[in-house]
Design a protein with these regions (language model features):
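Conserved class I S-adenosyl-L-methionine
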Residues: 32-41
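Conserved SAM-binding loop of SAM-dependent methyltransferases across substrates and taxa
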Residues: 42-55
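Conserved SAM-binding motif I beta-strand of class I
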Residues: 56-61
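C-terminal catalytic and target-recognition region of SAM-dependent MTase-like enzymes
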Residues: 134, 148-196
Length: 196
């Protein structure tokens, strides 16, 4: 996969290097799958899914800047087909879809929310520790039978409330998702595989 990166005028480059293993795993699992990327940033996980043969991808982020960047990343890789970019508040979108009578279904979902957000574009303040249970429940409601949800956070003090999520199968895969060049910082992010 090829990605446009920025080394000039942003604090971020457009690519989270520590997420290489999860993106590669998504690519390897994506063949003929319907992929949903929430809080998608520049869409790199969606590009990996498309390169891996995903039947469709839906890339959702609140920022037009990042969605334009995601489109450039798709174009850079010559990706065509059923790959949609949607500007939306992911929390509101998820809540609406999870409560819908006819829910969309996805075989693979990547959920990598911010630790905290009080964006003017959002209806409410978001705190990953306080809000992760509802967020994961809503995302899991969109899983097709046999589907997998990958949830990641870089909040160093994060604690998964497995008691409140006991109706889901949750596996901590954090150790396997830390690339070798980040191994000295094992808390760079946490990652779980979740299914119903």
């Amino acid at each position: 996969c090829q990605f446009g990166v920025n080394f000039e005028d942003y604090l971020d480059t457009g690519l989270f290097l520590d997420h290489r293993p999860i993106r590669l795993m998504i690519q390897q699992q994506a063949k003929n799958k319907r992929f949903l990327n929430l809080f998608a940033y520049t869409g790199s996980a969606s590009v990996h899914a498309a390169i891996g043969g995903a039947r469709s991808t839906l890339t959702i982020d609140m920022s037009n800047t990042y969605l334009d960047w995601a489109k450039r990343n798709f174009d850079l890789n010559g990706i065509r087909g059923d790959h949609k970019l949607v500007r939306a508040d992911c929390l509101q979108w998820l809540n609406e879809q999870a409560g819908a009578k006819h829910k969309p279904q996805f075989d693979l979902i990547f959920l990598d929310p911010p630790t905290f957000s009080n964006s003017k574009k959002m209806d409410e303040v978001f705190d990953i520790q306080k809000d992760h249970v509802q967020l994961i429940h809503d995302a899991a409601a969109l899983l097709a039978p046999g589907g997998k949800l990958y949830f990641s956070t870089n909040f160093r003090r994060f604690k998964m409330d497995q008691g409140a999520l006991k109706n889901l199968l949750i596996e901590d895969i954090s150790k396997a998702m830390i690339p070798e060049d980040f191994a000295r910082d094992a808390k760079i992010h946490y990652c779980w595989k979740i299914s119903r």
